[in-house]
């Protein structure tokens, strides 16, 4: 099942270890503190236990969220880059698992 992992970790060293653990489990870094990928229930549980050991008593938060295919098809994203032409920015709405569609006004 697709899985989102989001974290907000105060300590740089701990945050880096969380980042590396997510990469070790085959997840893709899609935003600064957000990973996405395909994981079985058992692999999600293994990652959870590993992250719990990494964080220990340090200040921070981790969210591991399984996402079903139906909900993934309903997801939407907006991506605009600096210097992007206005026409491209208007078309920057994407739907994971589907081709990009132009945003509609109104």
UniProtKB/Swiss-Prot annotation:
Homodimer, forms a heterotetramer with a Cas1 homodimer. Mg(2+) binds at residue 8. CRISPR (clustered regularly interspaced short palindromic repeat), is an adaptive immune system that provides protection against mobile genetic elements (viruses, transposable elements and conjugative plasmids). CRISPR clusters contain sequences complementary to antecedent mobile elements and target invading nucleic acids. CRISPR clusters are transcribed and processed into CRISPR RNA (crRNA). Functions as a ssRNA-specific endoribonuclease. Involved in the integration of spacer DNA into the CRISPR cassette. Its EC number is 3.1.-.-. Keywords: Antiviral defense, Endonuclease, Hydrolase, Magnesium, Metal-binding, Nuclease. Residues 86-106 are annotated as: Disordered. This is CRISPR-associated endoribonuclease Cas2. CDD domains: Cas2_I_II_III. The lineage of its organism: Bacteria, Bacillati, Bacillota, Clostridia, Thermoanaerobacterales. GO terms for molecular function: metal ion binding; RNA endonuclease activity. InterPro entries: CRISPR_associated_Cas2, Virulence_VapD/CRISPR_Cas2. The keyword Metal-binding applies. Pfam families: CRISPR_Cas2. Belongs to the CRISPR-associated endoribonuclease Cas2 protein family. GO terms for biological process: defense response to virus; maintenance of CRISPR repeat elements. Its cofactor is Mg(2+).
């Amino acid at each position: 099942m697709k899985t989102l992992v989001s974290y907000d970790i105060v300590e740089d060293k701990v945050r880096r270890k969380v980042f590396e653990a997510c990469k070790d489990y085959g997840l893709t870094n899609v935003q600064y503190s957000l990973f996405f990928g395909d994981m079985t229930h058992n692999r999600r549980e293994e990652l959870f236990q590993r992250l719990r050991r990494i964080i220990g008593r340090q200040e921070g938060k981790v969210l591991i969220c399984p996402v079903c295919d139906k909900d993934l098809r309903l997801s939407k994203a907006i991506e605009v880059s600096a210097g992007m032409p206005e026409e491209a920015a208007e078309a920057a709405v994407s739907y994971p698992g589907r081709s990009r569609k132009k945003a509609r006004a109104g």
